[in-house]
Amino acid sequence: MLTKKNLKNPIFCIVAMNENRIIGDGKNLLWHLPGDLKRLKKITMGSPLIMGRKTWDSIGRPLPGRANIVLTNSVTWKAEGAIAVNSFKDAIIKADEWIDNNIEINQNVTQKKIFLFGGAEIYKIGLEYCDNIEMTKVKFNSKTGTKFPKLNESDWKKTKLEHNLAKNGVPEHSYWHYRRKVQIIE
């Protein structure tokens, strides 16, 4: 059984959402934030990413310099550059193996962190294992779409890292780091 206590590497969550916790429409991102994409790359480079198949499909290609682990219900699904798994536990095992194999090859780049990369089902399954969330909050008027799970705000220490006003068609957004106040160990 997978518990936080027996995790080999810490699991982080990275997400962009609006004030209604909307993360997408089930197919695409709802906004384009070039600065956030650079930030995402910097934070996740050298780490395994765990994502659902719909998230993989919306990206359309593997993200270089990272393991692209895709959790899918299909036992026959394959895609170039993806590591297909059928359970969250298998995703963690593959992520740990990738870290172990890559840390010796390129220890300057490989991070001992696993990132939950979306979508909503991946966050729902994996959030209990996370003690850190890298969050982008986007000012974007939408009340319908795929939602990030509701957090118990009192369980998290929130630090605002940066705020960006709307400019040149890019919506207002801010970067936050959430750290769980009491880390759950089972």
Kindly label every feature range from the protein language model.
Residues 2-186:
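Enzymes that bind and transform nitrogen-containing heteroaromatic metabolites
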